[in-house]
């Protein structure tokens, strides 16, 4: 792997998620997330906007403009859209007109298949990358949290992202046990949206559903104190704009089944973990990352249900990108886990 020595000032760590894309660049550090959303003209195929700007256009555009997410459940479903998104964000982060060929280190779920690898390579080529390397997300997370020196003791990471949940146990030898599921922040948003529609006969958008999830989700099982948040939508009956008050019990009913599926997956992974690592995990706790890990009281809820201490990492939405950007510092430890695409 002679290419390793060539990495340097133009290394870019990339975490492309279903909800957001985050970059970590050697020359400027963390590049805060842009939404993984694109706007395209249905007739001409021309891309009109990306990121937060495209997301803000959702529900406000004429029928010929399509707003979409090129990633679904942590996999590329729109190659061209992903290439446009990645290319736009990388180039925006450099000086206008600057000619460069970056080297990309991209986070991927454990067990990515050949089709998905090819899709990532095509997206990287569109950016002009002269080298592309894949790193498993759990390993990137360990590096992003600064835990690489403690891996030999056993580390459990629960990554509850926008499109999937990844649960991993790592040791000095790499990933020991892992599990991928489609329960995610996005499925919670859909459940909230459907609950409001069925219970109140109101249609709300995904942004409103996410706001309700953040305001009222997770901590219901800890304090048992009912809470209320207001939201706006369109009445299914009259078609007019209305404002309603939604309760924490409503949100609990919506997202509980999803949370408890995640908890079941955590238990299953613990049951498959070698006994030599379990004591360390129980002592050091479960590390939580991903956007949905930030729901109020989620760490305490997991601690209570699973019986193992859990805590949310600093900047949990960004640790994968930071870890990818610094991966080459630990090349001797993780050489076998880095996949050279070209």
Where are these regions (language model features)?
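Nucleotide/phosphate-binding catalytic cleft detector across ATP-hydrolyzing
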Residues: 1-160, 168-286, 293-342
